[in-house]
Amino acid sequence: MSKSETYRIEVEAVAEYVEAQSNPEDDHYVFAYNITIRNTGTVAARLVSRHWVITDGTGHVQEVHGQGVVGEQPLLAPGESFRYTSGSVLETAVGTMHGSYQMEASDGHRFDAPIPAFMLAMPRVLH
């Protein structure tokens, strides 16, 4: 069995604009994102840390590194999923996020699980 089949984590992200917490007049745009992390490999793996690359509409890039997610380092058995919600604040009405989770398999192997890029956008801004 190849390493790509053994150590496989799929990440899905869905973002939404949080109008109630945003203030466009002050360039304060709040977005929530829902993440689903699914272990589609053949060994258990723990999410150890995260790395986000957040780019706003002007091209300004912010990188975020941290341990776990929402205060947890979930252990995912093969076939298991973990879901969480978090947020990001931008100074522009649009932006993108992508990154990776650093995982540690039950056999000690460490690997990165890529987080595909997703859009942060205030409704009716993009055509």
Swiss-Prot record:
Please report any disulfide bonds recorded for this protein chain, giving both cysteine positions. Answer: none
Record domain ApaG: where = 3-127
**Gene transcribed to yield this protein:** apaG
> Which terms does the UniProt entry file under GO BP?
error-free translesion synthesis
Could you name the domain of life of the organism this protein comes from?
A: Bacteria
InterPro entries, alphabetized:
ApaG_domain, ApaG_sf, Uncharacterised_ApaG
Protein name (database record): Protein ApaG
